[in-house]
Amino acid sequence: MKKLLVFVMLLVATIAESQAQEHIDALLNGDIESNRYGLTMRSAVKRDPATGKIIKRVVELTASDDKSLAKEFIAAFKLDRNTAEAWDENEGGTIYNVTAVWLNPKRVYTLATNGSMITVIAQTIYREEKNNNN
């Protein structure tokens, strides 16, 4: 019975972790129409020079004059809120800013909107960088 209970607990934890930030990622990884006015998407990957393994991945999306996309991201962030380990949100008028943090691997997602202007930054840190200044 104990083995079954441990298995179920691990299964629930794994499912919860796999569902973290799924709505945000669906928007970032989906086919956002490239012909939307003022949409820019950039991505960068930092690798360990010795092993070639990914240390950090950053995706940045910016858009201007796109209220519908801003609303989609606000909704996605709010849907993923219950899976975040940390959440900082500021809202007032046409401004909405939120930073959400998930662990294992560490993910820091930031959304900043001001009316129809939007910026989303998604950072995934797979492992901390070694400090070579010793």
Model-derived segments and spans:
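Mature extracytoplasmic domains of secretory-pathway proteins
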Residues: 49-96
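Generic structural signal for short, solvent-exposed loop/turn connectors between secondary structure elements
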Residues: 21, 67, 79, 105-106
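Short secondary-structure junctions and interdomain/linker hinges
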Residues: 15, 34-35, 80, 84
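Flexible, processing/modification-adjacent segments and terminal tails
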Residues: 22-34, 131-134
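Bacterial Sec-dependent N-terminal signal peptides
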Residues: 1-24
